[in-house]
């Protein structure tokens, strides 16, 4: 299977994470109806191909868009020139219908039919069943414009390969290499973009962010946190007046406690089972005052 030189996603200039997952109704109304009416698509994601001239495993490389499922507009080949039965012979095998047809409606009106088919390798009726599946969408009679015989000439097909549980474990070296390259490329790109975003943040120089790391509230409640480690911290600088920004009272509470200490109104209990500790923080880079936290055992 040939390798495409250019990435269709890059050429379409789509935002990261964008995927093409249309509903059955959208495929019929927004794409097939417009195709048979001669509408020009500004964003071409479904290509034209004579699907029955190829084996299904050759189709992904011919698609304009898609990763695990691929979409095509295909002429509807008939078995007999004046008949209505379609010709299902394709490449080295044939497509065989499975299940029952599904009527697709839009606003309560029947607009088309969805048919499921499975590809068999070899000649009918003794072909070997494969995991290649096709959903064929076609318009029904009253969806066609009067006097237009070309509306039945096109069908829209979705092609994909069904993966069984046993085959998920059996990955060929080529597939593994391709998946690893895709995963690493995506991860590297995402990591690079994250670094760019983080580098764009302003540097916050505030000593109050140098508090020792507390893994959980349980560490504090169990009395295992070393409050003595806070003694080595430099005093928190006084905040400059903020221009019209709201104050949440956290820093004021810290200053009030500091004033009480200077006046001798704060009594320290050294040998009690209870522990009260207050500390404040501020982030002047964002203009937000800190908060006062109190933990009791």
Swiss-Prot record:
One of its GO terms (biological process) is regulation of leaf senescence. GO terms for cellular component: nucleus. PROSITE patterns: NAC (PS51005). Expressed in leaves and in root pericycle and epidermis. Residues 14-162 form the NAC domain. Transcription factors that bind specifically to the 5'-CATGTG-3' motif and with bipartite regions with 5'-CGTr-3' and 5'-YACG-3' as cores. Involved in the regulation of metabolic reprogramming during senescence by promoting the chloroplast protein degradation and the catabolism of lysine, phytol and free fatty acids via the induction of CV, LKR/SDH and PES1 expression. Also triggers the degradation of starch and the accumulation of mono- and disaccharides during senescence by enhancing the expression of AMY1, SFP1 and SWEET15. This is NAC domain-containing protein 72. It comes from Arabidopsis thaliana. The gene is NAC072.
């Amino acid at each position: 299977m040939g390798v495409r030189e250019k990435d269709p996603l890059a050429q379409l200039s789509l935002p990261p994470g964008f995927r093409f997952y249309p509903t059955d109704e959208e495929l019929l109304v927004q794409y097939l109806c417009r195709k048979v009416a001669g509408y020009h698509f500004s964003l071409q994601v479904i290509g034209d191909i004579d699907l029955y001239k190829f084996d299904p495993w050759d189709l992904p490389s011919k698609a304009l868009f898609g990763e695990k499922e691929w979409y095509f507009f295909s002429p509807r080949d008939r078995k007999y020139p004046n008949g209505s039965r379609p010709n299902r012979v394709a490449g080295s095998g044939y497509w065989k219908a499975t299940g029952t047809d599904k009527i697709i409606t839009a606003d309560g009106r029947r607009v088309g039919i969805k048919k499921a088919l499975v590809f068999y390798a070899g000649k009918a009726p003794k072909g070997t069943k494969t995991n290649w599946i096709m959903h064929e969408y076609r318009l029904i009679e009253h969806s066609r414009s009067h006097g237009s015989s070309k509306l039945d000439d096109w069908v829209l097909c979705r092609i994909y390969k069904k993966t069984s549980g046993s085959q998920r474990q059996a990955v060929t070296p080529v597939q593994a290499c391709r998946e690893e390259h895709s995963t690493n490329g995506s991860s590297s790109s995402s990591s690079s973009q994250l670094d760019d975003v983080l580098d764009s943040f302003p540097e916050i120089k505030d000593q109050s962010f140098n508090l020792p790391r507390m893994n959980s509230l349980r560490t504090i409640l169990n009395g295992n946190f070393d409050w003595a480690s806070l003694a080595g911290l430099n005093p928190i600088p006084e905040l400059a007046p903020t221009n019209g920004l709201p104050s949440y009272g956290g820093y004021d509470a810290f200053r009030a406690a500091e004033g009480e200490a200077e006046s001798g109104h704060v009594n320290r209990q050294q040998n009690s089972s209870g522990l009260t500790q207050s500390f404040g923080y501020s982030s002047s880079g964002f203009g937000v005052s800190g908060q006062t936290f109190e933990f009791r055992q």
